[in-house]
Amino acid sequence: MLDSLKVTPRQVTGSGPAAGQSTLAPAPELPEPAVAGWRPRRQNARRVLALAALLPLTVILAVKAASLGTQVFVNAYGMGVLGATILVMYVSFGNYRDPSEDATTLTARPLVSCLVAVRDELAVIETTIRSLLNQTYGNCEVIVVDDFSTDGTREMLTALAERLPFTFIALDRNVGKKRALVRAVEASAGAYYVFTDSDCIVGADAVERCMLAFQAHPGIGAVSGHARALNSDKNLLTRMQDVWYDGQFGVSKAAESVFRSVTCVSGPLAAFRREAIYNYLPAWAGDRFLGAEFRFATDRQLTGYVLGQYWIGRKLKHQYQNSPFVSAVDYPERKWGVAYVASARAWTNVPDTFGRVLRQQTRWKKSFIRNLFFTGAFYWRRGVLASALFYGHGLWVLLAPLLAFRHLVWLPLHGQFLLTALYLGGVLLKGSIWGLAYRFQNRGDGRWIYRPLMSVLSATVLSWLLIYSLLTLRRSVWSRG
């Protein structure tokens, strides 16, 4: 065990009736198996042409802005952002294929360890556990680690573990999400790991879809599922985030998956081969940045070890050679692929107040900064097009607050309101392109209209959080919002 994990856990292994028979509460109604309602996306010329047809509009917008005397750099940035958006969609809609579709049935069912770290999630954690126990895959073990909850979560889980078949570990001090999950791995026996956040519901067939992808593609070391907002109907903010989630997974991750280089296997549903991450867990749990422990970047950082281990793995294992995660077994460094499985579904509770959105986005931007230094150091080796997506996105995020200041503050102060209007028009255009993509993937769903609103919120408010995140980078608190 890692030195910093030397806590005194209390462990309870459930041996009671199966899920659905708890005497504490009836089993919640779970969404139907994801694949049952999912429409596979093949190469579709009409969709590609519809998206590509927007490219001339992007050029016209840039030319018009240039004719008004703005700087070449600013025009190139705006044109680049819109052009890159269309390129990502072209790659996604024209080339993505769900890797789980390449295997019709499972020829074997090795043990899968489903792992959850929880802190103060009394209202939702039982639902999360039940969704894992209800998996169609069958051969799963569920391990839940409580990271020193103070809201009654620990007591509830202690009682629940006597009635449902899962292993519960209670830590006697708060160690952070990464270290709590490493403790779960130590107690596991599976050849594959499935992580989910403690406020999520995992589709009944999600583990099976991930395992089909692993079986069909031995070179894939990790896969991300598809996440939507569980509480999307609550208010305007949750609906905006739900539509945004759909695009981030169904378009952005799909495009990265074409190159087998998904940069973030996200928390709602993240699956890994044991051999792809086991040796790097001490480096992950003990990650330090700018001289301090860095508790964020849990998903991105772990994905980075899969993507980059061929180039950085040996050095990391040497650094942690005394850890049992390295000394007990030494897996070879491989050029693993990382993919996205669209038919593996999960639902997560998104922030439902503006303050919670800001706190979550701040946490994510801190993770982005850390990941830019870590993954950015080797990602260029993943190929030209994959690298263009990664570094182009990084450049866009870094420049976004500067462009927002210029167009929303500096130019209006100097009376150039037309340029501000053009900037906001470009933001709305970009959001509308994403909204169109949402319509393509969700026929008959009118929520696409919320996507342009999310783009405006991101450009005018959320982009500024990058500066605040930089200033508070060393402040590390595990909080969901």
Model regions and ranges:
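Non-transmembrane catalytic domains and loops of membrane-associated enzymes and transporters
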Residues: 2-16, 24, 104-379
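N-proximal low-complexity "stem/linker" segments adjacent to membrane-targeting elements
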Residues: 24-127
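Loop-to-transmembrane boundary segments
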Residues: 36-47, 380-395
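Membrane-embedded multi-pass helical conduit in multi-pass membrane proteins
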Residues: 59-97, 104-106, 389-476
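A general structural signal for short secondary-structure boundary/capping elements
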Residues: 268-273, 288, 386-394, 407-408
